[in-house]
Amino acid sequence: MTTLSHPAVAESLPTETLLGWLRDMYLIREFEIRTMQAYQNKKIGGFCHVYIGQEAVAVGCVAATRKNDPLVTAYRDHGHGLARGMDPKYGMAEMFGKLSGCAKGKGGSMHFFDAANSMYGGHGIVGAQTPLGAGLAFATKYEDEVMGGGKSDKVTLCFLGDGAVNQGAFHEAMNLAGLFDLPVIFIVENNGYSMGTAIERGTTMAHDLGAKARANGIDHITIQGMDVMSVYDGMKPFVDQCRENSRPGFVDMQTYRFKGHSMSDPRKYRTKEEEAEYEAQDPIGRLERVLKTQRDVADTDMEAIYDAQKKIVRGSVEFAENAPAPGLDELYKDVYVEPFGPWTGTSLPEMLANDPNYNGGAR
């Protein structure tokens, strides 16, 4: 299949749009800094994977979509949720295990969820979100075209790490997406390492991940993911094409995480020189320079935006600290679909057992 080219369109966008991207990246960066502090202070339990260094990917990709386009991702999910519009206080409360969290404190860091913004979760099993991405695309297409009788115009974004391309579920999802013409874009956030394993050591065709898309008849592009303007330039026409022809796509999004795979990762598999090389390409610094040199935005204006995001995140931490913990009764909620009631200790959910239309399980 042809590797698609893309024009430079971000340069023509209003300064206010670029400042909005900068604001969102500031928010993600500050949120993750405070997340690390809270984790180190043992206010956050479980696993924790921060998004520092990769902010341009989530912000640029989301900017290229509509709010009702489904999004699903892996366990490094904070950036995607915030970029999609999740209120950071509900994300922070989730990691603190509080009832007011975006998943009632039951998901934690790896399982942000915000249906109001079409963010269908972070998922903890490597590659497990890829069949869900294909399924979301199938659902929107079926709903719009079969049930609605029109043409589907939704595009699902399915984010995954480079390690997930080695999982069988990913290849099955790609095959079905190509076979059924599903409008899903698989975005590989290729930060070069699957936990501590360099991509060249664990993945065939590491220099050309697009080969995996071509094998399934899927168009693909490669994007420089350390620059939010490049991300938007690549994603906007690609998303538009997927929306128009209702076909899948594949993106090799080349990026770099500044921190470890998780909070417990000492990063001994990377050299200090390598890390310094990529930190010099900080996506936030890149956009700051563009705004300063090409849009005449003053340093003080950008500092004011950052200070505002810091205040929002501080408020989110305070909200999470003061939010109520879930009661023991929450253990029995969200187990069954709500119309069929909570578990009551009997062999059947209460409302289902009391339903006059229930036939005792006979078929």
Model-derived regions: residue spans:
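Glycine-rich, charged/polar anion/phosphate-binding loops
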Residues: 170-173, 233-240
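Short gly/pro/ser/thr-enriched loop/turn and capping motifs at secondary-structure boundaries
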Residues: 79, 192-195, 257-259
